[in-house]
């Protein structure tokens, strides 16, 4: 198999109902077999380009196209069998109930002989480090495991063009290296062309041939060999919001502890067991237990650890959206404010002003047809009047750089914009406790800094923050402590579950090649 060639001539796309194009004036020529890292500030159109190359962007009703974009000299819609795409949101690519069937699905659509499919499936799962039975339910996978599953499905198809949109965003550091190396082995063996969108430049900089930086104003900011772009354009790109290894983000300024309100206990877990109810089951299956954790006002706790250890399940339980599977979880009076101690028994309106939750997938919490409408839902539910409601919404639109998208459909935003909107919807109700799942996913360095600065200000006024994260910059900037989840000491079939331990925030996770930028 040979790699696919990608060409663009004055190409652009404007989503229906949007005044500004997502991409405009794009000229590209990517040769067969090239490995390209695509960078750019949040909202520069990176994901739009990937969807277009995969032939899934939509038709005339979904937007207006200008110029020409070709894969092997044909429109992308005519080249779908040659292209494999891993999306930002892994949930959107899980189509079948069992792991093996899901990976085999693409091969079946390409009419790969049956005798060849299952060896491909097994190899792809091994390559991405998803060591699970073929019959394992996809509904029981964590976000990071679903990301590996989506990649395995693409690698099993052996396409001529591999498109990866933030493929390591939800992975732990070891998983980042494992997945990157699996991709490299696959494209080396097949000769496929590789195009990657990734904010972690250090992960890919030594293994790609070329970097292309998209300009939000249209066209390309920089294009050339990796070392050349990073050395000659690094400072300019960092100023534009592109993550450059030599220019780490600056931590926010924090108020002196003597000026911050005294800490109050908000929520306490003792011997807590957390779990979920799998599809077609009636009882929760425990995924982590023996968890002791105290959350206090004005403090930030980072939930860290490998994929699949139950971090998101713990976060949802602390937020009152899942009932504990065992142990003890109680809200103190400072949070309950007259309600009972069990958050999962509170009404949704009661949760609104006490606990705000940002899901791992932003789209799971969008309800309105516009960004402005989305931000107004919480304040309206709290009974805020028109003027006060509009003032609060406008302030958040401005603070999180969403002003120009106020009338846009939330589902047409970029991944980074969706994440900022999901955080803003929670901030709109001003809860005492924020529970955030991967809050910095998809952010460029400027929007990352603004988001972290906003959370720091909330901490200084007494809001408590709990965040599931693999972002060590975020931990260093905000966290007072880490709650580190550890994998089960035995197989799940034998009843083994994950555990967790609280440690100082300064205790770092083991350094990996992903963090140092080594290949």
Question: What are the roles of these predicted feature ranges?
Answer:
Residues 39-41, 304-306:
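The feature captures the beta-strand-to-loop junction immediately N-terminal to the Walker
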Residues 54, 319:
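Helix-to-loop junction immediately C-terminal to a conserved catalytic motif
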Residues 66-79, 328-350:
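ABC ATPase NBD Q-loop/coupling interface
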Residues 115-133, 387-405:
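Conserved ABC ATPase "signature" region
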Residues 137-141, 145, 409-413, 417:
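Conserved ABC ATPase signature
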Residues 151, 179, 423:
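Hydrophobic anchor residue at the start of the ABC signature
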Residues 155, 426-427:
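ABC ATPase C-loop
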Residues 162-166, 434-438:
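Catalytic Walker B motif of ABC-type/P-loop ATPase nucleotide-binding domains
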């Amino acid at each position: 198999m040979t790699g696919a060639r990608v060409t663009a001539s004055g190409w652009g796309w404007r989503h229906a109902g949007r005044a500004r194009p997502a991409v405009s004036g794009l000229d590209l020529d990517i040769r067969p077999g090239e490995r390209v890292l695509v960078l750019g500030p949040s909202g520069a159109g990176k994901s739009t380009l990937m969807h277009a190359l995969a032939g899934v962007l939509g038709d005339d009703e979904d937007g207006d196209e200008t110029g020409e974009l070709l894969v092997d000299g044909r429109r992308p819609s005519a080249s779908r069998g040659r292209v494999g795409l891993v999306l930002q949101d892994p949930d959107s690519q899980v189509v079948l109930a069992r792991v093996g069937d899901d990976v085999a699905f693409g091969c079946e659509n390409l009419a790969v002989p049956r005798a060849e499919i299952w060896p491909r499936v097994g190899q792809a799962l091994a390559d991405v480090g998803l060591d699970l039975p073929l019959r394992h339910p996809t509904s029981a996978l964590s976000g990071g495991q679903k990301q590996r599953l989506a990649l395995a499905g693409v690698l099993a198809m052996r396409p001529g063009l591999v498109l990866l949109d933030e493929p390591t965003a939800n992975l732990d550091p070891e998983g980042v290296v494992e997945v990157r190396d699996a991709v490299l082995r696959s494209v080396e063996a097949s000769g496929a062309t590789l195009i990657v969108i990734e904010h972690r430049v250090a992960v890919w900089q030594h293994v790609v041939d070329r970097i292309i930086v998209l300009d939000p104003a249209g066209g390309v900011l920089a294009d050339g060999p990796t070392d050349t772009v990073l050395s000659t354009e690094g400072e300019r790109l960092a100023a534009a919001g592109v993550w450059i290894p030599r220019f780490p983000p600056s931590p926010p300024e924090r108020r002196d502890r003597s000026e911050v309100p005294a800490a109050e206990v908000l929520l306490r877990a003792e011997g807590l067991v957390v779990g979920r109810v799998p599809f077609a089951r009636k009882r929760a299956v425990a995924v982590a237990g023996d968890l002791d954790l105290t959350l206090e006002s004005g403090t930030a706790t980072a939930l860290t650890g490998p994929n699949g250890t139950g971090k998101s399940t713990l976060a949802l339980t602390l937020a009152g959206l899942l009932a504990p599977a065992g142990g003890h979880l109680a809200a103190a009076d400072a949070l309950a404010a007259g309600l009972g101690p069990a958050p999962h028994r509170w009404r949704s309106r009661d949760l609104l002003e006490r606990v705000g939750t940002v899901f791992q997938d932003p789209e799971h919490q969008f309800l309105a047809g516009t960004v402005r409408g989305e931000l107004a839902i919480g304040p309206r539910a709290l009974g805020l009047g028109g003027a006060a409601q509009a003032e609060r919404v406008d302030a958040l639109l401005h603070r999180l750089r969403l002003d120009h998208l106020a009338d846009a459909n939330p589902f047409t935003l970029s991944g980074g914009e969706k994440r900022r909107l999901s955080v803003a919807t929670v901030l709109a109700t001003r809860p005492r406790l924020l529970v955030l799942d991967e809050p910095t996913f998809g952010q460029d360095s400027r929007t990352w800094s603004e988001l972290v600065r906003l959370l720091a200000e909330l901490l200084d006024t007494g809001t408590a923050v709990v965040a599931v994260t693999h972002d060590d910059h975020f931990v260093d900037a905000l966290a007072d402590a880490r709650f580190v989840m550890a994998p089960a000491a035995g197989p799940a079939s034998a009843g083994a579950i994950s555990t967790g331990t609280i440690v100082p925030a300064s205790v770092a996770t083991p350094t990996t090649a992903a963090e140092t930028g080594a290949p």
